[in-house]
Each structure stands twice: as C-alpha cells, then as structure tokens.
C-alpha cells in the first residue's frame, strides 16, 4: 500500500507547489526597488515625490489610505502667498508653494478674531485661503504620478529592514522595497522615524489631541477666523471656527492631555464649546454637524535630527508643525520640496542628505523654534483663565498678532513672565 501511494503523494506535492507558484505569479511582485521611496502621500510626501520623479528618479509612494486626503484631519487653513513671505522671510520657496489653484479654495479670509476666557475680543489682519484639503491632497498626489511616481494606496508601512529597505503590507500580503533614498512623511506615528529611533509618539505631552466638526447653517462672517481660549474650553490649546464658505465652517479644538481632565472625553469638550460658549453658541446655535474627525498634532518642536545616511523625515514625522498654533501645511510643502531636491542631489551628485536639514533649518528653523518658545510660555499661562484673560488684555491686538504669526516680541515675553510670577501663587 505504501508503494502504491508514492506516485499519488508525489503528484499532490507537485500540484501544491505549482499552485502556490501560480498564485505568486498572479500577484504583484513582493520585492520592489526604486531610486526613492516616500512613505506617506500628504503634502510633504507628495511634494517630495513630485520633485524627485521630475528629476528623473524612479519614485515609489506608499500611502496607507485608500483615497489620498480622506479623511481630512486639519482646519484647512493655508496662509496666502503674501502672508507666507511674512511668516517665513528666509524661505524663498514658501510663497510659490502656497499658491493654491483657485479650484481648491473654498473661502478667502482676511481677519483673525481672538476671544479670551472672559470674552474680551481682539482683531487683526491675516490673509488666508481655506482649502478643500481632500481635493488638494489628491491633486498633489496626482501631480507626483503625472511626473512618473508610482503611488501605492491602501498600503501600510511596517518599518525598515536595514538601512535601505522599507517593509509594507497591502491586501496582497507583505512586501519589501529597496531604495537609495527614503523619505519618511508618514505623520506623527511615523514608522520610518520609529525605525531610526526618533519616533515622535514617545512623549504624549508633545502631542495635541484635536477634534473637528464640519458644520452647516453656521451664522458667521466668512471673512473672519475665530480662535477661542479658556481652560474649560480647550485646556492647553484653543478652539476655532474657520469659515469654509457660506454658512459652512470647520469648528474644532485642540487640547493637551497634561492640562486636561482624565474623565472628560475630547468630544465632550467640543460639544460643550459649541453649545455653551457665550460667543460661539451665537454662531452655532442652529448649526448641524455634517461630519467629524479627530487627529494628533505634534507640537513638541522638530525632532533632534531629520536625516541619516539615506533617510529624511519631513512634515509631521519630523515634528515640523508651528507648535503655538498647530499649523503644518506650509512647513510640509516646504519640507517636501527640499527633500525631493536633496534626494536628487544625493543620487546624482553624491551630496549628503545633511543638506536637507541644513536647508530647512535655514528657511524655517527659526520660526519653528520661536513657535515652540511661545508654546512653552503659553503653558505657564493657559491653565489659569484669570491669567490668560489678563495677559491677553495686557497684550492687546498689537502684541497678540505677532504671537499668532509665531513671533515673540521682547515686551510680551517680559510682561508675561512678570505676570506669571506675580499672579500664579495666588491663583
């Protein structure tokens, strides 16, 4: 019996091997190679991929979402090109990168109104475009593809295997891809940064927890953005109403966990703001929630080092967010272009990737560090509504405006520190 079964056993083994081989052959190749691999197709990643591909480099983009830009996880606020010149005076590329095609602009604003805990109001000029972030991000990715980049959607970066290999998974299994240059633009959860030992998620206090509703039937001035402060509203952060267009607004807030109550849910903070704030409820009293989203925003400043021999970190993965206001689109676009150029210079000319860090520090480093200094100053003030209100009234629009623009006037720093020393012991 054993002898008679041998041909059958051999045939079954052969059939199984051939079946597995045919399955592997019908699937995508599990081992890939490119000149440049970009993890993440947000503004930083797509811009880096476009620049690299346009330089003639084979470029692979790995994006975890099925649709680029969805869900939207920001207030969709982007300063105008003119404002970019003021915000980043050492960055020659900023105004050009902020020149968004008109079809993606849903509203244009020219003023900002700040509301203190006791509802004192301060207004100043600041021009911004409110964009359709989902459509804009999708366009940025399509521009990268148009220049030759290979975009892989629904693909999750798992980490790095060695200095030049990225491991990722999709519906067909696990794959690895090798490249001469790797750009980690995969957000504050960055697996690329984690593989380098520079993961941003190590310290929760370096993150802002944010939640946002898109609301319809909002009673608003479409020309004005509103920012609300108060420990009960948004501990360690602020709330916002950003008009997307006629009667539609992004209404949200960001908090810092170390200042918040462990028992209060993030959604509870936002609902309380929408329903109870004396000023906000006049805008949102008849409004309806169309959609909601939550996100993590890195506010701990840039990671210590954003490059290694063949890896660069860009955008949120590098901590490149204006810490005092949470803005990250401008720096992501700037990072992306510099990273794409650095990849080309590295591969074609042998220039070390340290050029990437030298360049972004020159163009945006001062502003990123100043924003972090302002946040640290605010951390001493925001836990007390009395102190926050007093500081805002003392500063007035004249000095609050540069703070929102991420500049720290000397009189503000001196006055704020003096008030903190005098009032904190009795509050």
Q: Where are the regions a protein language model picked out?
A:
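Extreme N-terminal leader/targeting segments of oxidoreductases
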Residues: 5-9, 13-36, 54-55
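Glycine-rich FAD pyrophosphate-binding loop
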Residues: 41, 53-73
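N-terminal Rossmann-fold NAD(P) dinucleotide-binding loop
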Residues: 45
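Predominantly flavin-linked oxidoreductase catalytic cores and closely associated redox partners
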Residues: 55, 67, 145-280, 303
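N-terminal FAD cofactor-binding segment of flavoenzymes
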Residues: 65-112
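Short beta-strand to alpha-helix junction loop
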Residues: 123-143, 191, 258-265
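FAD/FMN-dependent oxidoreductases across multiple families
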Residues: 259-342, 347-348
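C-terminal helical "tail/cap" subdomain of flavin- and related membrane-associated enzymes
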Residues: 341-427
């Amino acid at each position: 019996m054993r002898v008679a079964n041998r041909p059958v056993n051999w045939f079954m083994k052969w059939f199984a091997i051939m079946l597995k081989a045919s399955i592997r052959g019908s699937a995508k190749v599990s081992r890939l190679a490119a000149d440049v691999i970009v993890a993440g197709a947000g503004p930083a990643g797509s811009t880096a991929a476009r620049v690299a591909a346009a330089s003639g480099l084979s470029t692979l983009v790995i994006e975890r979402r099925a649709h680029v830009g969805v869900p939207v996880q920001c207030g969709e606020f982007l300063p105008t090109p003119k404002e970019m010149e003021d915000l980043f005076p050492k960055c020659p590329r900023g105004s050009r990168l902020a020149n968004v095609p008109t079809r993606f602009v849903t509203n244009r604003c020219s003023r900002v109104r700040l509301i203190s805990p006791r509802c004192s109001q301060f207004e100043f000029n600041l021009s911004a475009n409110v964009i359709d972030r989902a459509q804009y991000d999708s366009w940025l990715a399509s521009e990268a593809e148009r220049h030759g980049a290979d975009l892989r959607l629904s693909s999750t970066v798992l980490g790095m295997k060695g200095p030049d290999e990225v491991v990722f998974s999709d519906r067909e299994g696990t794959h690895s891809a090798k490249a001469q240059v790797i750009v980690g633009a995969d957000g504050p959860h960055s697996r690329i940064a984690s593989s380098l030992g520079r993961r941003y998620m190590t310290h929760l206090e370096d993150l802002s927890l944010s939640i946002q509703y898109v609301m319809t039937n909002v009673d608003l001035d479409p020309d004005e953005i509103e920012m609300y402060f108060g420990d009960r509203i948004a501990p360690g952060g602020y709330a916002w109403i950003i008009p997307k267009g006629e009667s539609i607004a992004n209404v949200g807030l960001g908090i810092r966990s170390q200042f918040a109550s462990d028992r209060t849910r993030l959604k509870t903070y936002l609902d309380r703001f929408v329903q109870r704030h004396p000023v906000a409820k006049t805008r949102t009293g008849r409004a309806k929630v169309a959609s909601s989203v939550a996100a993590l925003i890195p506010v701990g400043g840039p990671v210590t080092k954003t490059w290694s021999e063949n890896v660069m970190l860009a955008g949120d993965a590098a901590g490149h967010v204006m810490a005092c206001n949470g803005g990250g689109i401008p720096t992501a676009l700037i990072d992306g272009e510099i990273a794409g150029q650095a990849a080309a210079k590295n591969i074609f000319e042998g220039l070390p990737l340290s050029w990437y860090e030298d360049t972004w520090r020159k163009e945006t480093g001062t502003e990123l560090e100043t924003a972090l200094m302002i946040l640290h100053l605010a951390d001493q003030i925001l836990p007390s509504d009395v102190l926050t209100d007093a500081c805002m009234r003392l500063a007035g629009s004249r000095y609050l405006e540069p703070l929102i623009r991420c500049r720290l006037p000397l009189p503000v720093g001196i006055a704020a520190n003096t008030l903190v020393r005098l009032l904190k012991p009795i509050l």
